[in-house]
Each structure stands twice: as structure tokens, then as C-alpha cells.
Amino acid sequence: MAVQRTFSIIKPDAVAKNVIGKITTRFEEAGLKIVASKIKQLSKAEAEGFYAEHSARGFFGDLVAFMTSGPVVVQVLEGENAIALNRELMGATNPKEAAPGTIRADFAESIDANAVHGSDSEAAAAREIAYFFAATEVTTR
């Protein structure tokens, strides 16, 4: 297995519930290292740009409104098979379908307010990391 980097967002619903530390602990206990992290309030333009691939879909406006409704935590996670591992930790997009013990099963309310985002491929991870972090902001641990 190769060491990979993946991108993670702890979304406004989870930040509002004050579970940033609990979610971060899940990443670290699974062997992922946090190599970049910042908390920020997304602007409408940032959210629209990040989710541009969904711009033609009916839920786009609601997604942008949700992602700008409060602060988020954007992170770069690093570890063996990081992309697949993070997706396993997150659980299914719909928390009602997420396996018990996953982040979404434990902390998410709905398919819209589903606590976390994670890259789904190496190409997406590279694009998403670069969207929020300069290369100089990502460390090696």
C-alpha cells in the first residue's frame, strides 16, 4: 500500500455540535496524520467553486447555503490508503445508511447535514487540497 493524502471537511453541522475533536480523534486513531488544518468560514464564491461539478444539479443552491451557514474545518490527512480509509471512517453519504460506528452514523443528522466530506479519488484529493491549501501549508510528519 502507498502513503496517500486526502482532503477532509468537517462541515458546519458537526462544527456547531462541537465534535471537531471527536472526529479528528477518529482519523488519528485509524492511523491518519493531519498534515494541514484550518478552520474557516466559506464565502459563497468559495463554496460554489469547490462544488462547481454539482452546479447543474437541483441541490446545488441548498448545498452552497449549507456549506456557508457556519465555519468548517478543512484538513489534509495522510496515511496508508488514506482515501479509502477516510471514506470507510465517514460511512455512507446518507447517515441512515451508514454503518454503526462511522462518523456519519454517530454525528450526522441527514443526507444534507452529513458532518464530513472526503475526497473520492486521488485526482479529487489533489484538486481539493490545492483549492484550500498552498503547497507550503501542507507539512510532512
Swiss-Prot record:
InterPro entries: NDK-like_dom (IPR034907), NDK-like_dom_sf (IPR036850), Nucleoside_diP_kinase (IPR001564), Nucleoside_diP_kinase_AS (IPR023005). Its main location: cytoplasm. The keyword Cell wall biogenesis/degradation does not apply. The active site is at 117 (pros-phosphohistidine intermediate). GO terms for molecular function: ATP binding; metal ion binding; nucleoside diphosphate kinase activity. It is found in: Cytoplasm. It is an enzyme of class 2 (transferase). Its EC number is 2.7.4.6. ATP binds at residues 11, 59, 87, 93, 104, 114. GO terms for biological process: CTP biosynthetic process; GTP biosynthetic process; UTP biosynthetic process. Its cofactor is Mg(2+). It catalyses: a 2'-deoxyribonucleoside 5'-diphosphate + ATP = a 2'-deoxyribonucleoside 5'-triphosphate + ADP; a ribonucleoside 5'-diphosphate + ATP = a ribonucleoside 5'-triphosphate + ADP. GO terms for cellular component: cytoplasm. Keywords: ATP-binding, Cytoplasm, Kinase, Magnesium, Metal-binding, Nucleotide metabolism, Nucleotide-binding, Phosphoprotein, Transferase. It comes from the Bacteria. Belongs to the NDK family. Homotetramer. Major role in the synthesis of nucleoside triphosphates other than ATP. The ATP gamma phosphate is transferred to the NDP beta phosphate via a ping-pong mechanism, using a phosphorylated active-site intermediate. This is Nucleoside diphosphate kinase. It comes from Pseudomonas entomophila (strain L48). The lineage of its organism: Bacteria, Pseudomonadati, Pseudomonadota, Gammaproteobacteria, Pseudomonadales.
